[in-house]
């Protein structure tokens, strides 16, 4: 096959014999000194045994993470050198240990530069930032009654609509449990007596008119008429008893 290649090359060109074929040597004698300057070095090269033959690997590939990987590379290079004669440079241990820094080491160095918190606790003190006066297990002391009166924030704010107000009284009546007794004036009493003399029962419309005229509420007008009717019934009952005959018995 080689003779056919040479013959075809010589016959195709007129001066074929003048061209000299470049000898690249045997496969066993391949090394760095056979590489030309214009040739790009391969980044990954493997032979039939699976050993990496590339000379331009990165530092992370040249230097292993442990002694086990370094010993493996040295053993593999020695075995391949004995079998094929190719020289493989072993990584420099000083370069691996000094120049390369793992990400974990850099993170540790960066963490060491972080400033510590200003509040440091000694061994005898509690590490929790809880006030010593009020331990975690005990409840905070409740303010006393005198303190409630002095502190406006702790006092319950009372709005005007929370208080009861009487129309006849000026100001507020406070928070008494019982309603104060309504004191009617002579004019109010006279007008109510006149109305009761004509009508002992009031309609809703008439009650509203009287309440507006006398400056009273509907409830006050209603209560006054109820009391006035009870008094009128009591007076009529006493009159009926006094008018009855002295025998008081049934007469056929």
Swiss-Prot record:
Residues 114-151 are annotated as: Disordered. Keywords: Developmental protein, DNA-binding, Homeobox, Nucleus, Transcription, Transcription regulation. It is found in: Nucleus. GO terms for cellular component: nucleus. Its main location: nucleus. It comes from the Eukaryota. Sequence-specific transcription factor which is part of a developmental regulatory system that provides cells with specific positional identities on the anterior-posterior axis. A motif (Antp-type hexapeptide) lies at residues 158-163. Gene3D superfamilies: Homeodomain-like. This is Homeobox protein Hox-D5. It holds the Pfam family Homeodomain. One of its GO terms (biological process) is anterior/posterior pattern specification. Belongs to the Antp homeobox family. GO terms for molecular function: DNA-binding transcription factor activity, RNA polymerase II-specific; RNA polymerase II cis-regulatory region sequence-specific DNA binding.
């Amino acid at each position: 096959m080689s003779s056919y290649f040479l013959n075809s090359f010589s016959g195709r060109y007129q001066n074929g014999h003048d061209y000299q074929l470049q000898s690249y040597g045997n496969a066993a004698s391949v090394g760095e000194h056979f590489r030309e300057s214009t040739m790009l070095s391969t980044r990954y090269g493997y032979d039939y045994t699976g050993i990496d033959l590339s000379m331009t690997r990165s530092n992370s590939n040249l230097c292993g993470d442990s002694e086990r990987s370094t010993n493996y590379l040295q053993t593999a290079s020695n075995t391949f050198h004995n079998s094929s004669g190719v020289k493989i440079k072993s990584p420099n241990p000083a370069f691996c240990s000094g120049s390369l820094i793992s990400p974990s080491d850099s993170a540790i160095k960066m963490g060491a530069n972080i400033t510590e918190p200003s509040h440091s606790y000694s061994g005898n003190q509690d590490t929790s930032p809880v006030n010593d006066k009020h331990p975690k297990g005990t409840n905070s002391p409740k303010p006393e009654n005198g303190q409630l009166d002095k502190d406006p924030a702790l006092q319950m704010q009372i709005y005007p609509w929370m208080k009861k107000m009487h129309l006849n009284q000026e100001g507020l009546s406070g928070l008494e449990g019982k309603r104060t007794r309504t004191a009617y004036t002579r004019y109010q009493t006279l007008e109510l007596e006149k109305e009761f003399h004509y009508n002992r029962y009031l309609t809703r419309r008439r009650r509203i008119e009287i309440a507006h005229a006398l400056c009273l509420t509907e409830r006050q007008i209603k209560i006054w008429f109820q009391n006035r009717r009870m008094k009128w019934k009591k007076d009529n009952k006493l009159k009926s008893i006094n008018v009855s005959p002295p025998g008081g018995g049934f007469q056929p």
